[in-house]
């Protein structure tokens, strides 16, 4: 509806949003209910695995998680993200930059797409960056 005036348009959804919704629908249909449960289990297990690789002082082990958690680093999270980017990692979201947490807090998300080896490499790189 790019060529239609805003007042006359019948919907406000753009092509990109519709394509994203269609892609999500296809993915969920292909997974099915059991597949979706399996993806959820993988996300949870891999998140807990990554947490187990980080020092206790960085992670609240009692915190309820699903596929993301907050790491409290010994350096500003933005600095850690920048250093990790140089190593080829997309590290997470510095919460302090959003005004949603302390400057040293990094929100890390884990999905079914990452292997245990990738998570081990990420944890090693994060420890190296933070302890430098």
Which positions does each model-derived feature cover?
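Generic C-terminal helix-cap and adjacent flexible tail
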Residues: 127-132
């Amino acid at each position: 509806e790019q060529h239609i005036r805003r007042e006359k348009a019948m919907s406000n959804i753009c092509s990109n949003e519709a394509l994203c919704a269609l892609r999500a629908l296809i993915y969920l249909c292909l997974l099915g209910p059991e597949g979706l449960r399996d993806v959820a289990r993988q996300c949870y297990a891999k998140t807990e695995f990554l947490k187990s690789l980080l020092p206790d002082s960085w992670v609240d082990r009692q915190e309820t998680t699903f596929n993301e958690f907050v790491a409290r680093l010994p350096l500003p999270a933005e600095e850690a993200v920048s250093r990790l980017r140089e190593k080829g990692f997309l590290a997470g979201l510095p919460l302090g930059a959003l005004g949603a947490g302390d400057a040293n807090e990094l929100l890390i998300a884990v999905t079914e797409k990452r292997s245990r080896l990738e998570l081990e490499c990420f944890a090693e790189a994060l420890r190296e960056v933070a302890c430098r």
